[in-house]
Regions:
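Alpha-helical promoter-recognition and RNA polymerase-docking modules of transcription initiation factors
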Residues: 1-77
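Internal acidic/polar
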Residues: 80-88
Length: 88
């Protein structure tokens, strides 16, 4: 499987996950989508030698975790900023 094929398979999942976490953590879905696309590249660079089924399993897990971590980090950052402005 090539990187392009992996991306084409994963792009709809990335979009769904991005929209899901964007609603929960009040962040931009485009940013989350980009994080998911970068996760595909990183996954392929590291695990390209795996069989296709295994590569997809690993890819699903890594994409989900990367998007989740980014969304959670952004939410904390926004929460911290709003608390800082309230104290001023």
């Amino acid at each position: 499987m090539t990187l392009e094929e992996l991306y084409l398979i994963e792009k709809d999942r990335i979009k769904k996950i991005s929209l899901y976490y964007a609603r929960i953590y009040y962040t931009e879905p485009e940013d989350l989508y980009q994080e998911g696309a970068l996760a595909v590249i990183e996954t392929y660079a590291r695990y390209a030698e795996l069989p296709d089924e295994e590569l997809l399993k690993v890819s699903h897990r890594i994409i989900n975790r990367k998007i989740y971590k980014y969304a959670k980090k952004e939410y904390r950052h926004k929460e911290y900023e709003s608390n800082a402005t309230e104290k001023d």
